[in-house]
Structure formats: C-alpha cells, structure tokens
Amino acid sequence: MKLLGISQFLLIVSLHVYGQDPTTIRKTQYNLDKGIAIEGYDPVAYFKQQKAIKGKKGLAVYDEGATYYFSSQENKEVFKKNPSIYEPQYGGWCAYAMGLGGEKVSVDPETFKIVNNKLYLFYNRFFNNTLKSWNKDERNLNTKADQNWNKFLNSQTKP
C-alpha cells in the first residue's frame, strides 16, 4: 500500500515537473475571456465563410480548457472532428505583437488572415491595424512569432 502511494506521488510530481496537460496550458497561456476563445467568434467560419462571425452560446464546444462558440451546428460538428485545425495561432493573441516582441496583445477578432490553412488574429484599435504591419514583413514576423510562442509554451512545461 505504501509503495502505491509513493508511485502515485512520483507520477504527480513528474507531471508537474516535466509537463503540463493541454488544459492547464490553455487556461494560463491562451487569450481567453472567462474561458471563451476568440471573444465568442466562430473559428470554423473564418475558413468556411472567409469572415468573422459571432458564435452562439447554445452552440458551444469545450476543448481542453477553452470554450468555442459556433454560428451553426454544421460548423460545430466540423470543429469537433479536428479542433486544432481551426484554432488561432499563438493562442489567439496578436500575431504581429508575438512576432515583433513576443508580447501577448489582445486582438480584434474581425481583423484576421489565413495563411497555409492557419488562422492569425491581429490587434486593430485606435487607428493601429497591425495586420498592415504584419503584411510588410510577414515571413520574418511569422518565424519570430513561432519562436516566441514556443517560449511561452515551454515555460509551462519546465519547473
């Protein structure tokens, strides 16, 4: 019995030291408002309708720490088959800010771009549309944003 207790303790410690589950990472690193992703916009609509469409609370899916709203039952079912395809890059934070300086900056969900079947969201307030700046140096900013986002994710998996 004592051996079982020690084994369970070691398992818990190793999970804490060597990695976090996806739910914990999302809850601590993703751009969520009370657990809601993309301010309630439908992630599938960006791809299928090529526009930002507000989702409905009644068409929600909880996925590893984040709740997504959908504008239609069809979009909800599509998402459930493979959520990672439709989730925004960098946890839903501004792609430009992530690339420029590794900062988590809120977004305007209606300012977005899809590149290589990946959804990028951008800050667009106070006459500052960061999508325009992103487009001027997209390749470089994308590379840096990937590196910076990985630092956030890796900080969750190290003691």
Question: Each PLM stretch: what is its role?
Answer:
Residues Q20-P159:
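Charged, low-complexity intrinsically disordered segments
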Residues M1-P22:
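Bacterial Sec-dependent N-terminal signal peptides
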